[in-house]
Regions:
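Short helix-loop capping/hinge segments that flank enzyme active sites or metal/cofactor-binding pockets
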Residues: 143-158, 206-263, 275-280, 284, ...
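Small-aliphatic-rich amphipathic alpha-helix that forms the alpha element of a beta-alpha
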Residues: 263-264, 297-321
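Short glycine/serine-rich loop segments
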Residues: 2-124, 311-332
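A short helix-breaking turn/cap at a secondary-structure junction
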Residues: 82-172, 176, 350, 355-367
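Short, solvent-exposed turn/loop segments enriched in Gly/Ser/Thr/Pro and often Arg
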Residues: 12-20, 195-197, 276-278
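Short, surface-exposed loop/helix-turn segments at secondary-structure junctions
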Residues: 131-134, 202, 250, 282-304
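Acyltransferase
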Residues: 2, 139-140, 166-193, 216-224, ...
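Short, well-ordered beta-strand elements within core beta-sheets of diverse protein domains
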Residues: 102-109, 237-243, 335-336
Length: 367
């Protein structure tokens, strides 16, 4: 990014270890939403989302494991792209083969700016052998964003047949946004993946806990630092340390089976859509939503389950502004593409942006 001419003006706030979809920590406190300071900015790139939405920055970079780019984008009415596995070098870390959940990506108020930042992020890095040589950054500027989408088929996943609880108004706001895809020539059909979605969730939390424990077990094992860890970090690490090798392998098999199911859907559909967040921005004083749509959340991150399908399959997913609920709070929509179709996702996002105009709604804090 520096080689591409980026000017870094500062660091933005994140939660401890990037865990959780609400940006707060004991050092800087909570980051407040760009459209309502009494509400959460999302997380973990909550500071970045607010900075972009409030015109402090044209673009910001971040990473996304469980919606860390997508949730703040949805909460602050901007765009955030979770890139395909290997598109953008992320790290390096001491383990470069096994962990393929967290990826780096851009955030911006429009798709041309998003593509410009991605053009200097993407490419091969010899320190990370699973990055792509064919994704050299210039490709995202050489190809035009404008594209004819007439005849394209889109699958609308919605709330996955009722599996995902949603706050009243979220699903309705996202459903209303579908007309903008139809306006650019796409056909949109409701579809439900033939998969045990609870099994996918269980596999996800095992693989996530395994990865979190692998990266942070040293802090847990050290008595001097264990007491400083927030409860969610302790929970993740303890779960990860208790997993057997076969449990991790079985979870990886479930992940692979889920990818194949989505690959089958992409034989019928060019893109998939679903909400980027199951709730509107919530009270900034909360640690996380403990109930959504009348259902109790059994983990600190269950309310973010909508971002898991794309992560589990390693697919590109763009969080796009979907409009505003009755209370004036933003909602977000995910545009999910096939493996390595990052450019196609940006092109559809650009067409949607031009048709909808949602991202051009400014925060009332800007006057």
């Amino acid at each position: 990014m520096r080689a591409g001419g980026a000017l870094f003006v500062g660091r933005t706030n994140t939660p401890e270890f990037g865990l959780g979809g609400h940006t707060y920590n004991p050092v800087y406190g909570a980051t407040r939403n760009a459209f309502d300071p009494a509400r959460s900015a999302g997380g973990s790139s909550g500071g970045a989302g607010v900075a972009v939405a409030l015109r402090m920055l044209p673009v910001a970079d971040g990473s996304d494991m469980m919606g860390s780019l997508r949730t703040p984008a949805a909460f602050n009415n901007v765009y955030g792209l979770r890139t395909s596995i290997g598109c953008v070098p992320h790290g390096p870390t001491e383990e470069v083969f096994f962990q393929q959940f967290s990826v780096a990506g851009p955030m911006a108020r429009n798709i041309p700016d998003l593509a410009m930042l991605l053009s200097v992020q993407a490419g091969f890095d010899a320190r990370l052998p699973l990055t792509h040589r064919h994704a050299e950054g210039g490709d995202f500027l050489k190809q035009p964003l404008a594209r004819d989408f007439r005849g394209m088929r889109i699958g609308w996943l919605g709330d996955l047949g009722g599996h995902l609880p949603t706050e009243p108004g979220v699903l309705e706001t996202c459903t209303q946004a579908l007309r903008h895809f139809e306006a650019v020539g796409c056909t949109v059909d409701a579809v439900l993946p033939p998969f045990d979605l609870e099994q996918m969730w269980r596999a996800w939390i095992d693989l996530r806990s395994f990865a979190v424990a692998g990266a942070n077990a040293g802090l847990y094992r050290d008595a001097a630092t264990r007491g400083l860890l927030k409860p969610e970090a302790v929970w993740e690490i303890e779960r990860g340390l208790q997993l057997s090798a076969m449990q991790v392998y079985d979870a990886a098999r479930t992940r692979s089976a889920w990818y194949q199911v989505l690959r089958g859907l992409f034989a019928r559909y060019d893109f998939l859509l679903m909400p980027a967040a199951q709730v509107f921005p919530f009270d900034v004083a909360l640690d996380w939503p403990h109930e959504v749509g009348g259902r109790a959340m059994d983990t600190y991150h269950r309310w973010m389950q909508a971002v898991v399908p794309a992560t589990m399959a390693g697919l590109p997913a763009l969080a796009a502004p979907a409009g505003f609920g009755a209370g004036g709070l933003p909602a977000g929509l995910q545009i999910i593409g096939p493996a390595q179709a990052d450019m196609a996702v940006l092109q559809l996002g650009h067409a949607y942006d031009q048709a909808s105009g949602h991202a051009r709604v400014r925060s009332p804090l800007l006057g």
